[in-house]
Amino acid sequence: MQKKLTSAYVHIPFCTQICYYCDFSKVFIKNQPVDSYLEHLLEEFRSYDIQKLRTLYIGGGTPTALSAPQLEVLLDGLTKNLDLSVLEELTIEANPGDLDADKIAVLKQSPVNRVSLGVQTFDDKMLKKIGRSHLEKDIYENIDRLKLAGFDNISIDLIYALPGQTMAQVKDNVAKAISLDIPHMSLYSLILENHTVFMNRMRRGKLPLPKEELEAEMFEYIIAELERAGFEHYEISNFSKPGFESRHNLMYWDNSEYYGIGAGASGYVNGVRYKNHGPIRHYLNAVEAGNARITEEHLSQREQMEEEMFLGLRKKSGVSMARFEEKFGRSFDGLYGEIIRDLVQQGLMQIDGDRVRMTKRGLFLGDTVAERFILE
């Protein structure tokens, strides 16, 4: 039975290369049962009887590692039973190295209306250093092709504080990103994750990362430059021109529920956060057995309130106290008043009418501030 959920995340775990910083659920595409995977994924999607979605996000891995015919099967299968009149945003992630003319033609024929390109950096030497196979020229070619095909809602991902990266290189990246004339970008500082090439190098003392002060300077520079170029810094890592915020990601930060479909995907349905089987074979067998999930966590009200704060405070607009009280039936001031007043005094938060939100300094310290909202 379709509850009021209006968002879904679909995971395509295949990649044409494995990047040195990535710990997402993914496998090298060669010799993988891709067609069988798509069949099983669509079977899982159909099991939820999804008809009305506001946002649909296809991520990975690399969805564009699929061939053009496979992409067509996926997009057709996901959208044929949807009421497209309510679908506001359908995003697909793409790799500048493998988005050819045939694949763009498939996207154009489908309801996809937003493309997110994993650029990471414009520096060819750095791209090689982080395990990416595309080149700077591929980025420009892809963006030109997408614009020519009529896509105006294009986003790119960039990473800063990369090994050996200088402030001059960050400035160069930001200037090149702005010159693309696109309405959205996400900029993430490099985070070292377990089971990645970079983490192994760091443990061996072979990864020269920028110092924390330089990373903070990079972050400040990025914000100032993008705001000067007409972008709004609407979430810790995200910048958009007016009206081009990622609606799907805003759904996450509003702590709304969503379906997670595919190997290793996470979802949040009826107060339950779940994760699907990750290894492809395990996932295929699980779908055949009628349940793709490997873990389920029933969130208590306390956990739901904590998540509401952690996620909501990532947004520039912060958290609405009235919405919080309406959602949970608890006094916001009774739970968090003292903590908020303390953080306001430290210059990390501000109260703006009905909303509490982070200051610029608070945003940079993101997680440290968020930890204060853990309820004992």
List where the protein language model places each region.
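Local cysteine-cluster metal-coordination motifs and their immediate loop/turn environment
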Residues: 13-26
